[in-house]
Amino acid sequence: MLMMKRICFIFFLIFSASLYAERDTRWVEIGEGTYEQGFLFPYKIKLSVPYGVKNIDEIKQGLFPVKIELDWLLIQYSKEDVGKLFYRQFKDKFKDKEESFRLSQHIINMFLNKLPSVQKHDHWTFIYYPDEGMRLFIDDKKIYHLVGAELNRALLQSWLSNNPVLTSKLFSRILKIK
């Protein structure tokens, strides 16, 4: 009986700590830039990390929480086009892992089906926690929770390592310190 109480107490501490961390994360914006895919500039992107995080390599590897805000620049973009855009983002980061991409296809399609059409200045927020995955919020309403370490890393990499100019702009505040 005592052992059961201890296990319940430990579970409660772990669960409450993750909820507390999510609500009370003090985000610091470290950079912003415009995402491009070919000749298309679909959105501006802002990168924020918790206060005190300064290691660029560890941020890129997904070892720290990250908040990514997208401000859409396109006047109007259909649900299908938004899905194609994110599909290419995933596919580009699975280049060397074609089989892994095929295995993840079902989860990727579920995510893509949740994405709505967009209009200029629509605001999306992706919040990533290493242990919990990535959540998508549109107008402060949770739309989807993307699970799977490889999928989350692929999406993070599509933003953080896609283009050297965008990468340097996203990490500009940290680069100025070093």
Predicted regions and their residues:
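Sec-dependent signal peptide recognition
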Residues: 5-10
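N-terminal signal peptide c-region/cleavage motif recognized by signal peptidases
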Residues: 16-17
